[in-house]
Amino acid sequence: MVVPDKSLEEFRTFTATQNYKIIQNSSVVQAVKLNQQYAIVFYHPGTIDLGEGLTLATDKQVIVYLEQKGTGYDIWVADPLYSQREVCLALNGREVQIAFPEGELTGSTAFTNIATLQPFDLQCEYLSNPLGVDILQPRLSWKMGATTSARGRKQTAYQILVASSRDLLDADRGDLWDSGRVNSAESVNIVYGGVPLSAGQRCFWKVRFSDEHNRWSAWSNPANWRMGLFAADWAAQWIGSAEMESQSVGGKKVNNVMADPWFRKTFKMSDIPQDAVIYVASIGYHELYVNGRKVGDAVLSPSVTDHKSRARYMTYDIKGYLKTGTNVIALWLGTSWAVFPAYQQKNRPAIPMALVQAEIALSSGKKLRIVSDNTWKTHASPNTLLGYWEAHHFEGECYDAALEKDGWNTPDFDDSGWAMAKVYSTDVIVSSDRTEPNRLLGEIKPLSVQEVSPGVYRVDMGINYAGWFEMQLQGQPGDSIVFQFSERERMLAAMVYICIYKFGLQRKGVFCNRFNYMTGRWVQITGLRYKPELDQIRGWMIRPDYRRSGGFECDLPLLNDIYRTTLWTFEISVWVTMWSIVLIVNVVDTGEMHWPL
């Protein structure tokens, strides 16, 4: 079909000869309809109501041909400007990006399809495409999506396909499970009913549903999950450093002096990996590095649990981090919850520990397993917990730049002077960390820096928040910079949140929290030889990466402010890796009781 785009008169003549129904005819958009076919010329970005509950929007000048096909719409798009690279269309709010073929400058066209009925937001155990599912029969969920709204729309049946490969799934073959037609309106926590699954197995799945008129929807976009390890699958051993903390002297608590430890293990690969996954459990927080690169963007992992009886493991896909030749897996452990008094075991020292197992499948067909044991190397890092991780004594971190060792997590680093890791025994239950991780989800910029007394500066971050504080620093070797955090302007370090940065030989450095966090709005800084600039400072609000499922807005500003304040309070107060009630204490988990006060 060719739609003229030169003049209104040509458009009228065209529609008249073709017996089209004119929907709109203006200098902004022209649209006609014949049966279930639509032709639309957008002279400017905009939206048009095509009738029968159908709206179409575009962000560019474009020609669109729309035809209903079964439960979907075929869409052809032409570029009247001969130079556009892509266009974003939205059919009843469902957006699709359409890219024009590269290299074609005249009359370039593109095609896509938007289904009127299609499941979306597929989840396995409440997560999207999760890694490390340690449930033999995972539960699957989805939502019913429709581009055309109508009363009484509902699901009357569903069919789930689960395959061992994406190719099989694309061919509509569920070799692991084909549920067949199940007459049910249920779409939440449908228990997997296929062949038994094994540790580390990848599962690809999709679903479709039947509506109130017994019409099948389109298949959902594919989703996947990877199985985790079960108790019998672990071949690794718990490791830690030999350094012990003296938690009390003469029956009194003393501050921690044990550095957060580093661990590393080198190994060789003769071939590129076809698949590679690593499971890391830790008592205390951890950061994982492979060949010098931090794996993932999660922070303060894994989730908090009672280490008297349990430890959580994280699952990481490390295929893209490995190479042929020498590789290294490196860990940075945070003391944190490992020394929390209520989580201690009599048969386990109060030190951070890790349990690591990597499963690597090479392109040659060979399999490689790397496990934590006494062949790993360990060394103290520059980071040390301040306080002793108990109510009113969480304090902060001390980073001593003089103890840095560049490249400690790279393959070529000389670790001959490092100690061997020590193997420990503990009877904690190891289970997967099946929740959204903590992430840096909001950058906070300071409002002002004030010199409150000679050499003492107070930073106003503009809002009370829970998260990290980051600052670019300059100083002389041996200088110590002290940061004291407070929720109230005139109350210094009310909850004893104190961090320290010590300069080494380098005269520049960056302080940022790593295995602890702060709460507050005001930061008092001592030890600097200059007044800091605002662009040298920033904060990070940290929370679990949950998706917001709703919102609130009305025409009363007071109610909108109450909603925003309540939402912010919730976001900074309920974490999967810690409980933080600003103005109370880190470990309190009774936020709902305190928020109304």
Where are these regions (language model features)?
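Well-ordered alpha-helical segments within folded domains of soluble proteins
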Residues: 589-597
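Extracellular/oxidizing-compartment recognition motifs
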Residues: 117-202, 206-584, 589
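Non-catalytic terminal regions with compositionally biased, polar/charged low complexity
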Residues: 4-115
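Hydrophobic, well-ordered secondary-structure elements that form the walls
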Residues: 1
